[in-house]
Amino acid sequence: MSVAALERLREMLRQQGGLIATLVDRASVAHADLDREVAPEAVAHSLGENGLDSPASLAAEGPLTEARSEEYELLVEAIYEGYLLHYGSPRVVRAPDADLRLLAGDRLYAIGLARLVELGDTPSVAELADTITLSALAQSAGERQLADAIWLAGARAVGWGSSEAHRHAKRLVSAGAPEAIEAMRTSALPAGA
């Protein structure tokens, strides 16, 4: 995760005002003691499988996003924070109950996707909408590792473009196929890896 991106997300949400601004954790991400409320496995989950960069950092590193890397990192962090409010341990927003976590998560999805629409990047809007949907399917099936793989593959598709392997992996996830996790992990790898 990029601490700078999370700090930008924190500031953006405060500036938006409204209910979401009241839920922003007051502690700086750079100085937060992550162990205070979050189990170690939840911290690892929020960073992506095997300690990889966050999906936002990965998406922002690609050739399709490099001209606006900070904006892409911020909007993907917003969407990923929404996902973590639903299924993990958020890093920026603290909601006191499950209903508020769900609403705040949905709001962050909307904020991130709206910023992406403003950039005119409709393929990435579709990709991240698929990522949200497919990771929710994986979570509902108790497949957290599959959800992680979906996020990493979705981030790679935003930064580098989709591929037939990635589209095939998404179809496998939708079908509930047992080989979906390996296909998704493979589609998340750099070309030629």
Residue ranges and their predicted role:
Residues M1-A193:
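All-alpha prenyltransferase/terpene-synthase fold signal
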